UniProtKB/Swiss-Prot annotation:
Residues 140-156 are annotated as: Mediates dimerization. Residues 88-96 are annotated as: Acidic. This is Protein Nef. The gene is nef. The N-terminal domain is composed of the N-myristoyl glycine and of a cluster of positively charged amino acids. It is required for inner plasma membrane targeting of Nef and virion incorporation, and thereby for infectivity. It comes from Human immunodeficiency virus type 2 subtype A (isolate BEN).
C-alpha cells in the first residue's frame, strides 16, 4: 500500500479501535494458557513477535492511536468507566456500535493474501486485537468495519473448529484464537461484569473455552489450518470425499451432504 493508503488507514483505524474498546471493557488480571502457564495480557508474547521473522506489512507511525488499558496501566476509575461503557453498549444496534457508513467507502472486493497480511500488521501496530477476548459480537465488528471502510466482503474470517488453538482458515490472516483460563483474581474481578467478553466467550464457543486473539507472524508462511485440519476445507482439501467426511464426523463437526 502506498503513502496515501496508509494515511487513509491511520485515519479510519481510530474508529475500529474505539468500537473494539467499547465492546472490550478493560484488561482483567492475569490469564492462563491451556498448558497452565501464566502471563498478563499477552504482553510478553507481543514483545517476542517484534523480534520474530515476519512478512512485514506497511509500517505505520506510532503514537496515532488512543491510550488503551492493555498498553498503559489504567486507573481504577478508568477501569470502572470502561466496564460501565461495555455494559451500556450491550443493547446497542450494530450500526450504532460500529459507527461506520451504511455503504462501503470504496468498491467492494474480496480479501486477498496480501491484503490480509497488510490488515493483520496494521491492526497489530494499532494494538487492536492482541490479547483481546474473542466473542461473536467482536467478530461482527471486525467484519462490518473492514467491509464498510475497506470494501472487504465479509466471507473470509473463519477459524478452525477446535478445541484448542483456532487457526485462521484464510491464508494471510495472521490472527489466531488461543484458549486461556482466567486466574482466580480475574474471575472475582469480573463477577459483577458478566456481560464482558471474558465471560461470554466461553458461551459463544461450543467447546466452552475462553478465547483471545493472538498475532502469529509465522502464519504468513505456514498455512497451519490447512496443514493440520485439511478436512475442514471439504472439497477444497484434495482429500477423497469419503475421507474428509469421516474425519469431520469423528471430530463431531457437522457438514452438508
Amino acid at each position: 500500500m502506498g503513502a496515501s493508503g496508509s494515511k487513509k488507514l491511520s485515519k479510519h483505524s481510530r474508529g475500529l479501535r474505539e468500537r473494539l474498546l467499547r465492546a472490550r471493557g478493560d484488561g482483567y488480571g492475569k490469564q492462563r494458557d491451556a498448558s497452565g502457564g501464566e502471563y498478563s495480557q499477552f504482553q510478553e508474547e507481543s514483545g517476542r513477535e517484534q523480534n520474530s521473522p515476519s512478512c512485514e506489512g506497511q509500517q505505520y507511525q506510532q503514537g496515532e492511536y488512543m491510550n488503551s488499558p492493555w498498553r498503559n496501566p489504567a486507573t481504577e476509575r478508568q477501569k470502572d468507566l470502561y466496564r460501565q461503557q461495555n455494559m451500556d453498549d450491550v443493547d446497542s444496534d450494530d450500526d450504532d456500535l460500529i459507527g461506520v457508513p451504511v455503504t462501503p467507502r470504496v468498491p467492494r472486493r474480496e480479501m486477498t493474501y496480501k491484503l490480509a497480511i497488510d490488515m493483520s500488521h496494521f491492526i497489530k501496530e494499532k494494538g487492536g486485537l492482541q490479547g483481546m477476548f474473542y466473542s461473536r459480537r467482536r467478530h461482527r465488528i471486525l467484519d462490518i468495519y473492514l467491509e464498510k471502510e475497506e470494501g472487504i466482503i465479509p466471507d473470509w474470517q473463519n477459524y478452525t473448529h477446535g478445541p484448542g488453538v483456532r487457526y485462521p482458515m484464510y491464508f494471510g490472516w495472521l490472527w489466531k484464537l488461543v484458549s486461556v483460563e482466567l486466574s482466580q483474581e480475574a474471575e472475582e474481578d469480573e463477577a459483577n461484569c458478566l456481560v464482558h467478553p471474558a465471560q461470554t466467550s466461553r458461551h459463544d464457543d461450543e467447546h466452552g473455552e475462553t478465547l483471545v486473539w493472538q498475532f502469529d507472524s509465522m502464519l504468513a508462511y505456514n498455512y497451519k489450518a490447512f496443514t493440520l485440519y485439511p478436512e475442514e476445507f471439504g472439497h477444497k482439501s484434495g482429500l477423497p470425499e469419503k475421507e474428509w467426511k469421516a474425519k469431520l464426523k469423528a471430530r463431531g463437526i457437522p457438514y452438508s451432504e
